[in-house]
Amino acid sequence: MYAIIETGGKQYWVKPGQNLQVERLNAEVGANVEVKVLWANDAEGTSADAKAGTDSAKVTAQVVRHLRGKKIIIFKKRPKKGYERTQGHRQDLSEIKITDIKIG
């Protein structure tokens, strides 16, 4: 049983019990959230496709923790002009655990 979900503008292939890091969710740690399902399939071969209009699939996930991603450095320089700018960025993330995939 697996599903393709969308959260934070990205798509993920998931199965029950899997942990993954997604863009920060507006939910407390330990809270259950329902994630948008694009496509799902179960062991019997039954599938649900959101684009075909069969919105019968639901994926439930639990927020494990909130964290920040790896730091990236942005450096700009103009040769021979003495122009240098450095900026850093760390993305806010949430780690979720897929608890259940239901079709129908």
Curated annotation (Swiss-Prot):
Pfam families membership: Ribosomal_L21p
Disulfide-linked positions: none
Keyword Cytoplasm: no
GO cellular component: cytoplasm; ribonucleoprotein complex; ribosome
Signal peptide positions (record): none
Keywords: Ribonucleoprotein, Ribosomal protein, RNA-binding, rRNA-binding
PROSITE patterns registered for this protein in UniProt: RIBOSOMAL_L21
GO terms classed as biological process: translation
MF-aspect GO terms: rRNA binding; structural constituent of ribosome
InterPro entries attached to this UniProt entry: bL21-like, bL21-like_sf, Ribosomal_bL21, Ribosomal_bL21_CS
Similarity annotation: Belongs to the bacterial ribosomal protein bL21 family.
Subunit organization: Part of the 50S ribosomal subunit. Contacts protein L20.
Primary role: This protein binds to 23S rRNA in the presence of protein L20.
This protein's name: Large ribosomal subunit protein bL21
Gene name tied to this protein: rplU
